[in-house]
Amino acid sequence: MENFRYEIESMLQLVGVDMDVISVDPYSDEKLAEFVSELLLWNKKINLIGKSTEKSIWSRHIAESLILLPYVQGSTVLDMGTGAGLPGLPLQIVSGSNIEMHLVEKDQKKVSFLKHVSANLNLKNIRIYNKQFTEKGFDGAPLVNVVTSRALAEINQLVAWADPCLVNGGSLVLIKGPVCKAELEKFEESDLSDKYENGEIVEYKIDSHDVNIVIIKKK
């Protein structure tokens, strides 16, 4: 996609973000293009994204990841079940050294892709873990102030997995589908919800595609 810097700025303006307070890597255009190229190449060998979404990769995967940018600035971030590095890698590419990113993925083949593309793009402040999440976290898990996830599990399960890694005052920032309201209500009736403030749902639309961001802050 040509002139993706314009696309980034337009998207951030759409969500009401002042570009003057957002750190954007000056080489993010080229790095995002290379990331997409590598993702499509590797997708021929291993299942990183759905084949039907390849043609809309910029809106369906990249832009959808980057709507989290306002919520992670200056943070230590853990991306649970990152898969192809979504949303973690686009956030890290655009933010540069402004955030510290931890990517967690249990599939060894996907981890190989994450390590390959991170090295090729010379990404800094990033760690990759080949680990399985449990409700006790995982061996070597960092403490972070933001946990992200995209299309991984229900909110109840995501909070249980994230809780050991999330500091008090930190937040889960989750990309969810249309059933997120029911999932959030179910979580707020659970015992674990006592440790968290009431969740918030922020709705976005990208190229007629509805995207819901669920934000849950730990007390």
Curated annotation (Swiss-Prot):
Q: Give me the Gene Ontology terms describing cellular component.
A: cytosol
Location comes to: Cytoplasm
What are the boundaries of the signal sequence?
Answer: none
Q: Fetch the Pfam families from UniProt.
A: GidB (PF02527)
Database matches in InterPro entries: rRNA_ssu_MeTfrase_G, SAM-dependent_MTases_sf
EC class name: transferase
Q: What task does this protein carry out?
A: Specifically methylates the N7 position of guanine in position 527 of 16S rRNA.
In Swiss-Prot or TrEMBL terms, this protein is called Ribosomal RNA small subunit methyltransferase G
Q: Which organism is it from?
A: Magnetococcus marinus (strain ATCC BAA-1437 / JCM 17883 / MC-1)
Q: Which gene encodes it?
A: rsmG
